Amino acid sequence: MRYGGWLIAAAMVAAPAAAKDRLGVYQSWAAFRDAETPRCYAIAAPEETVGSATRKAYLSIGFWPRSGVSHQIYVRLSRERSTNSVITLSAGGRRFRLKGEGSNGWATDRRMDLAIIAAMRSATSLSVESIGRDGRSIVDAYALRGAPSAIDAAALGCVPK
């Protein structure tokens, strides 16, 4: 699998040094469980990035059962964005304006999280776009092959036993 190394690297960046259980690798996506926190997440690295990346970008869907949080979208851009620029996620013909801080982006609320995931389930690719501090476009493109399976594995991985 072409993205295996990226997925593992992205997962390591996404989580503290706590032990993680790999729930599965699904084409360009993977699912992990961190039993100590506890939390589970589906994660992928971009298939393509426009321009030179200054950090490892990734997109994740997180589940935090103790906090009552599920299906939470999180994106880390490949470069630091301009303070005044928006972060736009596009999937399946739909566009979503994320809230952002630095190179990080989140859905504005649970309704948007679920709408993004619904769009992901019916699309083949997803892009996250913004403007970098240098004034150049940031475009991180993700393949969605395996995303539904990884999201489902992460959701099931955090169901209380």
What do these predicted ranges mean?
Residues 2-9:
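Sec-dependent signal peptide recognition
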